[in-house]
Amino acid sequence: PDNIMVVGGHLDSWDLADGSHDDGAGVVQSMEALHIFKRLGYKPKNTIRVVLFMNEENGGRGGKKYAELAKTNNENHIFALESDSGGFSPRGFSIEADDANFQRISSWKNLFEPYLIHSFVKGGAGADINPLSSGKIVKAGLKPDSQRYFDYHHTQTDTFDKVNERELKLGAAAMTALTYLIDKYGLE
């Protein structure tokens, strides 16, 4: 399909640790979203692409280069979703969109609320997807529970053993659900 939906996170981290929350979690969640679609046998209407960005921590050159290549190749990105706030329980999404698309996405909030995913707010979606600006692209960032994030963020404790597998999977499921809804029902 001609329209592209991006799901991604960044590969690089600070050298104090392996960067499991920042941003190994986002990388795993993004890949898991495609894995979930494949396991379900879902055939998307749009191209769903996982992008693992590089150099987010030191200039964002991976996101800038991806946007440059998308423009050069005349790719039509309609949606981009980034996970870069740790692998904790998902609590919502920050959404960069015009009013009509923000309202459309917010109308699905009731589908997420039983899982304590309740915060759908206008705001920045993420450093890696920020450079994408083709057409009326809608951008979103997964917002997990942030209570413990700065215990690990850019520290020597940001290691694999600090990531809760269940919370990581819940984040991947939330990303998959939002991507599915946009793919199936479209944007304004």
Feature roles, as predicted:
Residues 13-104, 128:
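Acidic/histidine-rich catalytic neighborhood of metal-dependent amide-processing enzymes
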Residues 88-188:
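Active-site-adjacent substrate-binding region
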Residues 1-12:
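Acidic/His- and Gly-rich active-site-bordering loop/insert found
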Residues 11, 54, 144-146:
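A mature extracytoplasmic/lumenal domain signature
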